[in-house]
């Protein structure tokens, strides 16, 4: 489950509070900024604030057609650091023309941030129990990549 209480680290190193909410178990759509699951996309038009979509490994942009022009952000969930599909999803969404915020969630920590940033991510929700300040300090550990990026 997405933890909306955690702070958000931007690729420029700034830290901010998360403004997005999820639909609760009661099914009531909250006011303000909302992140929807793929199954909840039918409620997109009713969101009063910013609109975000949570993409898991089961909802590939290759096999699903998302309303990219109606979304302010897409959250890509990393179930485990050794699962590279989230990187591919980010690059694919950028190639498909998504201009909004790409946010990495789930198993996100300092050692993977540069790879995520190079794949097109703008913001990161650092895994609970990991130090967000340490992660921010490591954002520029690698300044000269040897491979092309997105």
Short names for language-model regions:
Residues 1-41:
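N-terminal, charge-rich interaction modules
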Residues 3-17, 46, 57-59, 69, ...:
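Phosphate/adenylate-binding glycine loop and adjacent helical scaffold
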Residues 33-35, 50-54, 73-75, 101-103, ...:
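Structural preference for beta-strand elements that scaffold enzyme active sites
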Residues 52-92:
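Glycine/Thr-rich beta-alpha phosphate-binding loop at enzyme active sites
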Residues 55, 62-66, 110-123:
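Catalytic cores of alpha/beta
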Residues 57-58, 103-109:
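Glycine-rich beta-to-alpha transition loops that act as phosphate-gripper elements at the mouths
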Residues 121-139:
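Glycine-rich phosphate-binding active-site loops on the catalytic face of alpha/beta enzymes
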């Amino acid at each position: 489950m997405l933890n909306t209480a955690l702070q958000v680290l931007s690729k420029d190193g700034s830290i901010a509070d998360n403004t997005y909410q999820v639909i609760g178990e009661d099914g009531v759509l909250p006011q303000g900024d909302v992140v929807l699951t793929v199954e909840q996309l039918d409620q997109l038009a009713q969101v009063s604030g910013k609109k975000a979509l949570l993409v898991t490994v089961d909802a590939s942009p290759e096999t699903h057609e998302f309303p990219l022009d109606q979304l302010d952000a897409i959250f890509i969930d990393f179930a485990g650091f050794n699962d590279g599909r989230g990187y591919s999803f980010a690059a694919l969404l950028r190639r498909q023309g998504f201009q909004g915020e790409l946010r990495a969630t789930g198993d996100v920590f300092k050692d993977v941030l540069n790879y995520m940033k190079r794949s097109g991510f703008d913001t990161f929700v650092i895994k609970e129990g990991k130090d967000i300040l340490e992660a921010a300090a490591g954002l520029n550990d690698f300044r000269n990549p040897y491979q092309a990026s997105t």
